[in-house]
Amino acid sequence: MTMAISSALPSPLLLAASLLLLIVQAQGITRHYEFNVQMANATRLCNTKSMVTVNGQCPGPELVAREGDRVVIRVTNNVAHNISLHWHGVRQVRTGWADGPAYITQCPIQTGQSYVYNFTVAGQRGTLWWHAHISWLRATVYGALVILPKLGVPYPFPAPHKEVPVIFGEWWNADTEEVVNQAVQTGGGPNVSDAFTINGLPGPLYNCSAQDTFKLKVKPGKTYMLRLINAALNEELFFAVANHTLTVVEVDAVYVKPFTVDTLVISPGQTTNVLLTAKPYYPGANFYMSAAPYSTARPGTFGNTTVAGILEYENPAMSPSAASFVKGLPLFKPTLPQLNDTDFVTNFTDKLRSLATPEYPAAVPQSVDKRFFFTVGLGTLPCPANMTCQGPNNTQMAASMNNVSFVLPARALLQSHFTGLSSGVYAPDFPVAPLSPFNYTGTPPNNTNVKTGTKLLVLRYNTSVELVMQDTSILGIESHPLHLHGFNFFVIGQGFGNYDAVNDPAKFNLVDPVERNTVGVPAGGWVAIRFLADNPGVWFMHCHLEAHTTWGLRMAWLVLDGSHPNQKLLPPPSDLPKC
C-alpha cells in the first residue's frame, strides 16, 4: 500500500520543475535580440536606392514577447547617421533610458557605437511597434512589437486561426533625409511620398509594382487576426478589405468592446487589431485589401494614392503544390471614404470603448489634480535674413503647442534632469494654457508667428491629469495624431469648434472610454484625455505626422520621483550614449 501511494505521488524533482514553470510563467523570461543598423539596397517602383535598415530588412524584425517578459535589444549603428530607437507604446515604467527619442531620453547612438535597450513589458499585451526616433529615419527603420498574453491567459474573444502583422508605410524614391533637409532649408513643406506600402510592398495599383504585392492566403471559414500598424510618416489612412467585414477588438495594445465595420481609420503611431472571418466557401475570386489617406490638409501637402494587398482563398479542389495565385479570377475592390471624410472618422472613433470588465478594468481617474489646455496647430517663423522661404508670405513653416515651437536640445533632457544640470538645456515653464487666447477655430489671426523654446511641464508623482487639446485654424484646420510617451491615457471626450470648459465636461465618458497612447485631435475640434502621472522621467508628447514634429509640434512632461523607492527613476545604464 505504501509503495502504491508513493508511486502515485509526484517526485520532488517533478514538483520542483512544476514550481519553476509556474514562477517563469508569472515573472516572464528574458528575450534577447540583436539589431544591426545597416545600409541595404531596395527596389520599388522600378527605382533602386540604398537606405537605412535594421538587419537589412524593411520592415525590420518582428519582436515577440509575452506580458511580463524582459526584452533586451542590442543596437549597433553601422551607418553614417546617428540613430535611436523607440518602442512605441511600451510604458517603460522607471526605465525611461530605454524609451528612445533622440535628445529627449538619450543622446543618439553614434556611428560604430552600440546601446542596449533593456525593459520589461509589464501589464501590457497586444500590438505595439518600434521605430527610429531621430529625423525621418523611421521611414525605413520600423517593425512590429507583438506582446502575447501570459501563458494560459486567453484572448477575450475567440482565438483566431492565424495572426498576421499588416504594417502600413510610405516609400520615397528619394532619400528621406534629403527630403526633410530640403524642407527645413527652404522653410516649406516636404515633398510627398511616391507610394504607400503594406509590409514594405506598394502593390499592383502603382506602376512597376505588380510583383511587389502583399498577399494574404486564407482558408474558407477560418478567422484571422490582422495586427494593423500605421507606420506611415505623414498620413492617416482608411483601410478596408473588399466584400469582407472587420471586427475591431483592440487598439494601441488595449482590448476594446468588439464592433464590426466595413472600413476603419488608423493614424500614424496607432495600432488596431481586427478579426477577419473568411467566407465559409471558396468564392472563386480575390479581394483587394486597400488603404488610402484621410487628410484635412490643403491639397498638394499629402499623397493621394491607394495601396493594395490581395486576399486570396485556398481552393480545396486544388493540390497544395498548385500556384498560390490563380490568374483570371475576378478581383474585387473596396469602396473607401472620401479623403476628407471627417464625419466617417468621428463615427468610427465614437465606437471605441474599453472593455471595462473585472479582468480588464478601465482605471479612469475620477478626480483631477491638474487641468491643462493646449492649442495644437501650425504657424510660421520669420524667414532668416538673406533667404527666400517657401512658407506663406516668405515665412518658414512651423508648428506649436500653446504657441511654443519645441526646439530639440543639444543634450538629452532626461540626463540633464537626472544629473541636476538642466541650466541652459531646458526651462521648466511650459505654459499650462495659451498665453493669448483667441477664437481658435474661427477666422485665423493676422499674426501667425510662433515662439520657440525647449520647455517642459513639471508634474508631481501620481498627479491625475486632464488635458484638453484644441486644434487651431491658423494656416487651416487639420487633424493631428498626438502620441504620449511613457503612459496610456483615456479619451474621455471630443468635439468640434472651440472647447467649452463650462458645458463640454458634462459629456465626458468616465465609465468606459477607450484607452490608448496616440489620439487624433479632430480637425477644427478638440479632444480631452486623462492619465495618471505614475511614471517618473521625461516623457515626449508630439504629433505623429513627421512633418509637423519637424516643425516643432512637440513638448515634454517631467514627472518627478515619488517618495518610495519603487516610485523613482532607475539610474542610467553604463552604456548610455553620449552627445
UniProtKB/Swiss-Prot annotation:
This is Laccase-4. Lignin degradation and detoxification of lignin-derived products. Disulfide bonds: none annotated. Its main location: secreted. Its cofactor is Cu cation. Cu cation 4 binds at H480, C543, H548. The lineage of its organism: Eukaryota, Viridiplantae, Streptophyta, Embryophyta, Tracheophyta. Binds 4 Cu cations per monomer. Pfam families: Cu-oxidase, Cu-oxidase_2, Cu-oxidase_3. The gene is LAC4. Its EC number is 1.10.3.2. GO terms for molecular function: copper ion binding; hydroquinone:oxygen oxidoreductase activity; oxidoreductase activity. PANTHER family: LACCASE-4 (PTHR11709:SF522), MULTI-COPPER OXIDASE (PTHR11709). Cu cation 3 binds at H133, H485, H542.
